[in-house]
């Protein structure tokens, strides 16, 4: 991957994490392409985009890299948020999470990832690990059976499209929840892989005609919006973590595709103006840490605003983990502060790791 493609994908990652944070603050960065209609599909797409074919013949290297890059930091964060949750419980009398048990610390992360409310966005990390592992073995099998990109695309499309009907035909247990999430996310991983290998350098899908078609399709999709009184999202939303698709069967697939296209289009359009902004490049490099820490930062901002306005912290206990103080006035302040603070937290963490831990492991 050359520097231009690397920087483009880094800015795309920065946009993706901003969409996650803006979604949790209930506003849309991309207008009619609302975050809860595609934000995590975009991250799965990026993972497929970055997948290297060399792993198809080197499973050990793939597993070693994924465990070190995804699961090891995940459980360090799990330990950190265990401590934070216990401290907050001691100070406020509210336990933001599930009971502290061996199962909830080690097993629940692979089921729903909501053992601690403040770190619940990290459910995506363990799901990504499972999805990419399944993707690796499926790709190995498919290439042996029939090494044809259209056949592979049809296969993964069928898998993805069957996920939503399955959620309506079966009881959503911890096991079926993982199956449904994996099925749907596999489609977007392969879509990213397909785009990187067969579309990006061969077809221009960002022409005015493409833009008109995608905007028209999105306008039609809004006719199917059921999110009139949103608890999650701000239109056309679905909640993949809980396999909640409401009354929809296929619309979430289409809104994910249009949202991914819109994100790619925005990055292509603005790349000449954004490529030299170091903060955006840094943000794209620390999306894991932003995902992990943004709810904690919002919680702290809320505590400060409550204190400034003379409101007891007990008011915070009456709401869920996503609640913020006076959202009409403060939403964008939360967004800017959260993105800045979590980005620099991530930068500091990466520098500390490089200085303190990398030399130790390099000697082994």
Regions found by a protein language model. Give the residues of each.
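Alpha-helical transmembrane segments and their immediate juxtamembrane cytosolic regions
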Residues: 1-364
């Amino acid at each position: 991957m050359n520097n231009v493609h690397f920087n483009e994908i880094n800015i795309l990652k920065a946009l993706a994490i901003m969409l996650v944070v803006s979604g949790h603050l209930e506003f849309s960065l991309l207008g009619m392409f609302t975050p809860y209609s595609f934000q995590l599909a975009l991250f799965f797409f990026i993972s497929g985009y970055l997948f290297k074919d060399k792993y198809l013949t080197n499973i050990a290297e793939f597993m070693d890299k994924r465990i070190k890059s995804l699961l090891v930091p995940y459980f360090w964060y799990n330990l950190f948020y265990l401590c934070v949750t216990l401290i907050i419980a001691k100070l406020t009398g509210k336990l933001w999470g599930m009971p502290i048990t061996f199962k909830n610390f080690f097993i629940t992360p692979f089921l729903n990832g909501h053992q601690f409310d403040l770190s619940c966005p990290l459910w995506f990390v363990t799901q990504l690990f499972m999805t990419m592992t399944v993707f690796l073995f499926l790709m190995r099998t498919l290439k042996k059976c029939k090494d044809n990109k259209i056949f592979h695309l049809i296969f993964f499309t069928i898998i993805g499209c069957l996920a939503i009907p399955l959620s309506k035909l079966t009881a959503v247990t911890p096991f079926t929840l993982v199956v449904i999430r994996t099925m749907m996310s596999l489609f977007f991983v392969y879509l990213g892989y397909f785009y990187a290998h067969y579309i990006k350098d061969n077809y221009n899908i960002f022409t005015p005609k493409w833009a008109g078609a995608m905007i028209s399709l999105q306008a039609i999709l809004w006719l199917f919006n059921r999110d009139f009184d949103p608890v999650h999202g701000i239109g056309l939303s679905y909640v993949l973590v809980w396999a909640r698709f409401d009354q929809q069967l296929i619309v979430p697939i289409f809104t994910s595709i249009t949202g991914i296209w819109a994100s790619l289009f925005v990055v292509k359009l603005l790349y000449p103006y954004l490529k030299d902004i170091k903060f955006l490049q840094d943000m794209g490099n620390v999306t894991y840490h932003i995902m992990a820490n943004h709810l904690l930062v919002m919680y702290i901002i809320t505590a400060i605003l409550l204190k400034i306005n003379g409101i007891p912290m007990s008011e915070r206990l009456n709401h869920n983990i996503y609640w913020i103080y006076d959202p009409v006035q403060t939403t964008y302040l939360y967004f800017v502060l959260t993105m800045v603070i979590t980005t620099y937290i991530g930068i500091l963490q990466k520098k500390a790791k490089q200085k303190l831990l990398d030399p130790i492991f390099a000697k082994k």
